[in-house]
Amino acid sequence: DTVSVAEISSFQLETIEYFHPQVSAILNITPDHLNRHHTMENYVAVKEAITMNQTKDDYCILNYENEYTRNFGDRCPATVVWFSSARRLDNGLFYEGEDIYLAKDGNVQRLMNVKTDMNLVGICNIENVMAAIGIAMSAGVPMKNILDTIRRFVAVEHRIEYVATKKGVVYYNDSKATNTDAAIQ
């Protein structure tokens, strides 16, 4: 079997007709590309289109802490896998203390410690890791393989890339951030 993983832009989502991902994800929706989409409502609708051909047999990973993705959860045609960086969830992935947990069917399992098991910093990367866990487990990847991969993963160039520490201040290069919300996170 061949698995393809692709980031689909809102521009590409405007023209999809038959695209049917088995697993999709919307990590966040913030004001962006409004020069093209004109209103936030239009932009949100285009982002949600990634699920238009999905069914309950498919999965959509959504960020519970983003107002737009949280509101979409009830309308989403796929089985939703939530993640949260700010609260404990009854079902889904969540970050609490320094750990990432998976809550499912009344059981809570500690998956990893972000300080010792991740080579990335920042809440945005914790959210990215939770989304990646949700995507991979929904695709049937064994949890051990997922966690081993996360432990080995290092930051890529221009994405919260460590530069130096001077006089107790840590400097990072995050020049790939495409909007103010991305830079702040």
Q: How should these model regions be labeled?
A:
Residues D1-A86, L93-E96, Y101, N113-L120:
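Flexible active-site lid/hinge loop adjacent to a nucleotide/diphosphate
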Residues K115-Q185:
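Nucleotide phosphate-binding/pyrophosphate-handling subdomain across enzymes
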Residues Q12, R87, N107, K167:
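Residue-level detector of flexible, active-site-proximal loop/helix-junction positions
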Residues F94-M112, V156-A164:
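Acidic-glycine-rich active-site phosphate/pyrophosphate-binding loop
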